[in-house]
């Protein structure tokens, strides 16, 4: 196997490493920090590509598939908004972040050295710790933990994801030193604390998914039954421990209370409002399946739907902000094009990670497992909230899957025994 192609100078290598180290923490600590990190990383990636870091190698099938998936959002929005005669630039903001992931992947697959990818060992736990620090500094512990620019749902989602990326990153590229292992464990604990304080129930649903991914990647055929039993036991233990934590107990109890009130005709609860908005979205999708209602169409439909009694005034007010489901949001706004886009950005990267998850090269296999956690994690988060309506979360998702896919498939890159 040929050694990886190094960046054209040491400055580029250092900048790449610094960006990868800092971007998860900047998501929580600096308004605009995540977007700024991605823009700089994308610009540097383009410079590396123009400098010939790929040495004119042809694109591989996986790279082409990734590029098509990441560009599908811009194409979908363009087609639908042309149909609706509304091409306001703001509609393309989040989708543009996905496109920026393409040069990042292409450059890092060939220009990423061991030093560059080694930064990820620290990035994810530091990001989780930064989330806890941001909540503590801003003293927003009253009801739901949040920051001045990240609401409690997105905060909890990102924190729980970084917690498990920290945990699964233990002994990523070899046997970790004790300080590095303690850092990763601290990141895991910090992420869990923020998730509990945020009381974001959608993030908790992803925990069994993360565990299942890890077990699948380490599954050996002759131990199938033992693995299934261990998974069931792990879920049971986590469930029992979680039930003893008051905020979790309270939020889980509210699910049954909300559903009971909804059946009794009291629709303006947390779950009741979501059910109303999902019903409204499905109604509009049935009426406009091909081109959707346009980027602003769902918000505009809220008042008329409230006036005819399909949804309550409170649901209409909240629906002007979001649909509370990423898949329904993209489908109701952009029709089958939006549905294709959101499925592509979830499951094409997931498939590419899945192919690498049982690689004989541990660093690449662990990178792939973590990538599977990111893609399926965002899929689960997006069942109950829009995840890509915020540009910073769209940037975080697209940057992270690009970086992890580069680490999982990097040309000739089989780093070993970092962290010693």
Where are these regions (language model features)?
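Hydrophobic transmembrane alpha-helices and their immediate junctions
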Residues: 333-376
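Alpha-helical transmembrane segments of multi-pass inner-membrane proteins
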Residues: 19, 23-24, 100-103, 108, ...
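Hydrophobic alpha-helical membrane-interfacial segments at the cytosolic entry of transmembrane helices
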Residues: 65-72, 119-130, 185-190, 224-245
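Transmembrane signal-anchor hairpin modules in multi-pass inner-membrane enzymes, especially those
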Residues: 1-79, 86, 100, 106-122, ...
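Long extracytoplasmic/lumenal interhelical loops at the membrane interface
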Residues: 265-276, 287, 291-334
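Transmembrane alpha-helices of multi-pass inner-membrane enzymes
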Residues: 43-44, 371-420
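Membrane-embedded alpha-helical segments of multi-pass membrane proteins
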Residues: 32-52, 92-105, 154-163, 205-212, ...
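A membrane-periplasm/extracellular boundary helix in multi-pass inner-membrane enzymes
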Residues: 197, 218-264, 282-287, 295
